[in-house]
């Protein structure tokens, strides 16, 4: 009897160890797929979608429709991120920032990543087409196409990849708008313009910090093509200057009120000021300051709009 109990205990211990190993493997796989989905970019995409949906809504918000929109958008964006990983798997080996990603590190097979990416993109688009509307599904398809097929290869060809890549980066805000309204009007294009312009200082600051990595990988980012930084600074300030008057347009059009005008002016001005140190000293520390300001900008703008619409 004692032997049987001991034998049973040993079996239970083995099962516990096996279960623990399985859990660790599952956790590891989950973290791999999370990294393939580019959660940092996904979060910005979802913020932009919420912003567009909120502003495109007249009357009460349909929370169910918003949830479905975010689900379809998240699946499409995650799949696009995975396919970007797949296409850049060789390039990523040369950069310190990316050499430990799942594919260059050999943690997952390329075919598995490609299948995952395609499945996620198709699932996301189908959800948007069937459960939301055709226009929103088309915008998601266009976003994925431009990001995967156009922007990703252009990084090896021209420094204009940032400006072209900012188009799919700005489309999610239109997707949010069309999900709630079913159409695109002038205000939606204003939001698109804000998102398009915002991406330039955001991504140029990243490109400046990672210029050594990009040069090693032979990617045609502007700080690599023109290492003195003059062109990069001009591009940053050109787009920041354009942002200031464009952020006034929702107030001028009567879509948003005085609280928005004051708040948007303050955060856009702060965004502009955060770029001044980089213009003076061209340091990575100053570029990081601008990057942090750009990440702070979008959720701040969303909060200002929500508060403004709440008091209108």
Regions found by a protein language model. Give the residues of each.
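Intramembrane alpha-helical segments
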Residues: 110-179
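Membrane-embedded alpha-helical segments that form the functional core of polytopic membrane enzymes
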Residues: 47-89, 97, 125, 138-149, ...
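Cytosolic, membrane-interface loops and tails of multi-pass inner-membrane proteins
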Residues: 14-28, 87-108, 204-232
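The first (N-terminal) embedded transmembrane alpha-helix
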Residues: 38-55, 167
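Multi-pass membrane catalytic core of lipid/isoprenoid biosynthesis enzymes
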Residues: 97-138, 227-251
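Transmembrane alpha-helical segments that form the membrane-embedded catalytic/substrate-channel core
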Residues: 75-83, 145-153, 194-211, 244, ...
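Interfacial loop-to-transmembrane junctions
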Residues: 231, 272-300
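Hydrophobic alpha-helical transmembrane segments in multi-pass integral membrane proteins
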Residues: 174-184, 243-248, 298-312
């Amino acid at each position: 009897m004692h032997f049987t109990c001991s034998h049973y205990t040993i079996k239970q211990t083995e099962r516990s160890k096996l279960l623990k190993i399985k859990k660790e493997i599952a956790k590891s796989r989950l973290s791999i797929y999370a990294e393939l989905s580019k959660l940092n970019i996904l979060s910005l995409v979802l913020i932009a979608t919420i912003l567009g949906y909120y502003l495109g809504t007249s009357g009460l918000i349909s929370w169910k429709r918003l949830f479905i929109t975010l689900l379809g958008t998240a699946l499409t964006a995650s799949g696009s991120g995975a396919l970007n990983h797949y296409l850049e798997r060789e390039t990523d080996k040369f950069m310190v920032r990316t050499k430990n990603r799942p594919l260059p590190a050999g943690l997952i097979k390329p075919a598995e990543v490609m299948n995952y990416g395609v499945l996620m993109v198709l699932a996301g688009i189908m959800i948007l087409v069937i459960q939301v509307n055709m226009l929103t599904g088309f915008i998601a398809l266009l976003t994925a196409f431009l990001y995967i097929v156009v922007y990703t290869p252009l990084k090896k060809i021209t420094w204009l990849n940032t400006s072209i890549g900012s188009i799919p980066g700005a489309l999610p805000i239109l997707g949010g708008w069309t999900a709630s309204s079913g159409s695109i009007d002038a205000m939606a294009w204003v939001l698109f313009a804000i998102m398009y312009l915002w991406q330039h200082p955001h991504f140029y600051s990243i490109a400046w910090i990672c210029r050594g990595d990009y040069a090693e990988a032979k990617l045609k980012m502007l700080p690599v093509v023109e290492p003195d930084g003059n062109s990069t600074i001009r591009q940053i300030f050109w787009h920041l200057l354009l942002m200031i008057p464009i952020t006034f347009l929702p107030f001028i059009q009567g879509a948003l009120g005085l609280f928005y005008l004051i708040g948007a002016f303050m955060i856009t001005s702060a965004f502009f000021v955060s770029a001044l140190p980089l213009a003076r000293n061209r340091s990575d520390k100053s570029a990081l300051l601008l990057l942090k300001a750009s990440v702070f900008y979008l959720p701040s703008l969303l909060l200002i709009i929500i508060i403004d619409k709440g008091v209108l």
